């Protein structure tokens, strides 16, 4: 899950992860499906090679069910990019349930040897329906001053005191386009990253942080 206001760097980060040689997701997937009203309009579109039947400008139940039928029993490594489709999701509770089902059964949807990964973007973290955002295993948060958003992130994810959480935010967002990366399933001492550099705590309550 990637959360950031317009211009924060969400799209650039997706392109970097997927398209740049040696990066995390470069050439890791057999199929990529994109659900986005805007990614197809990028200048020098890096997704031009993706077949038309894997690129959608909206997201609904019928489209997603059709895609799930296509990948069933293929054994493929599949990536869904759900970019800027929060409004489609929020207004459709059946779609929300289907997405939750996908997120909770990612390893079984494409058959033996296959898997489904999902990258979802939003301009505001708490605009994503709670049942969906609570299934996220990795969360990337760009700078925000939205107190309700930060309080939601803190209440749902953060196990350190709020004062320390805000010190982590201040330390992380010292440069434009920096992001806080959370590995949700890690223990509290190993879940925080400034960009992709893990924050090291000398003690459980010490915020004198050092990068790997």
Model region roles, listed by residue range:
Residues 24, 28, 141, 180, ...:
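Intrinsically disordered, low-complexity N-terminal regions enriched in serine/proline/glycine
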Residues 43-52:
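Short, aromatic/basic amphipathic alpha-helical patches
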Residues 150-188:
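P-loop/Walker A phosphate-binding loop and immediately adjacent motor/lid segment at beta-alpha junctions
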Residues 1-23, 27, 37-41, 56-163:
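Conserved P-loop NTPase motor cores
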Residues 32:
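An amphipathic, basic-hydrophobic helix/alpha-beta surface used to engage anionic
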Residues 1-4, 175-212:
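Conserved P-loop NTPase motor module
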